[in-house]
């Protein structure tokens, strides 16, 4: 295994342990097995893309993840802990790496899932091997829906939840919508969810395109949109694809003519567009300038900027929060037993933004507030792009309505 994949932790402490073991061997060889076991770190597997269109988001996800462990002094259960980070080259490759982390690296838990297609493949492996898995980015409905299993948890609200939150804003603009989404699980979820909402308000689909993931030239799509003259464009483009589209959208002079909207965007997607080109209304899970951030979130943002010399993107927070929640569950469980960790995750909760943040036990979906934001008319720096329009849900009753109930879910998993 490539040693660069393992975060070097407790180097000094481990050397001291090895020195102690050597001294003990001089006295009695019977001490050696005990010392070796004591020095063995707890390993956490991280599956995050190292290249491709999602890699910029993934960079922030992994930075937040490593920071979460550092804030625990790189320890879990009073033992040294380390993160083993592997790539997500494809859905199949991600599944193979998840299996390697479990079988060869002996990780006690998994974190990751940069894209929905990767997360769905990894989720199947986690369920098969009974390893707790916290998906920190993917939003496809199936993750905590039809493909759910008791060992997989998810941070991001599923696509239908975020789409429904956007409806009042979109309906006020008009009912003639054009769809431009990426041809994979996330984009397909966006298209199906918004089409259902549009049908419910008696609207019209005036165009519907699915672009291959990794597309760089969107000119043909933009020309079709311009000719169709929709009231707005529903986007479902991933990471670098979204960045490329918005740059070309501006170049074609469309940014001031037809509103653009998308859910579950990353700060980095828009930072890459540049402050003079960016436009739109979006949902995002967290924003570093949100005045309603909790004290813990504000402390995280400060710690991240101090360490990495840049503001914390939403993906940095998502990596940090997912890891922090998993690490808390391991410590709360008092062991690395997978079922004990799962139960600790399911029984955890905290108060934030007027709601009780928790995992619904029937599908392991995190219930947490998210934001509707729009791009500022005048952006004065390279990072602070958003006005926060609304935080959703506002209270626990609204959370139940937004995230749904077990009777309406496609998830039918057997509890551990």
Task: Report each predicted region and the residues it spans.
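Hydrophobic membrane-targeting signal helices
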Residues: 26-32
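Intrinsically disordered, low-complexity regions enriched in serine, threonine, proline
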Residues: 11-12, 34
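Extracytosolic ligand-binding ectodomains
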Residues: 2-6, 13-19, 38-416
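Cleavable N-terminal signal peptides
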Residues: 24-25, 36
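Sec/Tat signal peptide C-region and signal peptidase I cleavage site
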Residues: 32-38
């Amino acid at each position: 295994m490539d040693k660069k994949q393992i975060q070097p932790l407790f180097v000094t402490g481990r050397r001291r342990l090895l020195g102690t073991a050597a001294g003990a061997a001089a006295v009695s060889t019977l001490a050696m097995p005990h010392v070796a076991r004591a020095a063995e770190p707890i390993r956490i597997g991280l599956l995050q893309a190292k290249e491709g269109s999602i890699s910029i988001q993934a960079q922030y996800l992994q930075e937040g993840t490593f920071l979460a462990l550092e804030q625990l002094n790189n320890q879990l259960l009073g033992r040294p802990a380390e993160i083993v980070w592997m790539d997500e080259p494809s859905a199949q490759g991600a599944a193979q790496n998840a299996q390697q982390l479990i079988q060869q690296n002996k990780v006690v838990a998994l974190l990751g899932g940069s894209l929905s297609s990767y997360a769905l493949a990894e989720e199947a492996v986690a369920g098969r091997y009974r390893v707790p898995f916290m998906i920190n980015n993917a939003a496809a409905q199936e993750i905590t829906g039809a493909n759910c299993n008791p060992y997989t948890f998810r941070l991001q609200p599923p696509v239908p939840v975020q789409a429904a939150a956007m409806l009042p804003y979109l309906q006020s603009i008009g009912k003639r919508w054009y769809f431009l989404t990426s041809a994979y699980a996330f984009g397909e979820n966006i298209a199906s969810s918004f089409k259902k909402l549009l049908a419910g308000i008696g609207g019209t689909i005036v165009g519907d395109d699915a672009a291959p993931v990794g597309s760089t030239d969107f000119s043909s799509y933009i020309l079709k949109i311009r000719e169709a003259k929709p009231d707005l464009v529903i986007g479902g483009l991933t990471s670098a694809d979204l960045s490329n589209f918005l740059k070309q959208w501006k170049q074609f002079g469309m940014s001031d003519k037809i509103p653009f909207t998308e859910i579950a965007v990353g700060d980095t997607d828009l930072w890459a567009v540049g402050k003079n080109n960016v436009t739109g209304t979006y949902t995002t899970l967290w924003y570093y300038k949100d005045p309603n951030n909790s004290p813990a979130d504000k402390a995280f943002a400060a710690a991240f900027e101090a360490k990495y010399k840049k503001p914390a993107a939403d993906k940095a927070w998502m990596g940090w929060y997912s890891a922090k929640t998993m690490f808390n569950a391991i410590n709360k469980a008092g062991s690395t037993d997978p079922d004990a960790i799962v139960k600790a995750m399911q029984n955890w909760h905290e108060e934030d933004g007027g709601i009780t943040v928790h995992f619904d036990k029937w599908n392991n979906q995190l219930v947490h507030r998210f934001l509707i934001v729009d791009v500022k008319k005048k952006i004065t720096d390279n990072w602070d792009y958003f006005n926060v329009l609304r935080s959703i849900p506002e209270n626990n009753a609204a959370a139940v309505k937004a995230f749904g109930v077990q009777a309406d879910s496609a998830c039918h998993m057997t509890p551990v």
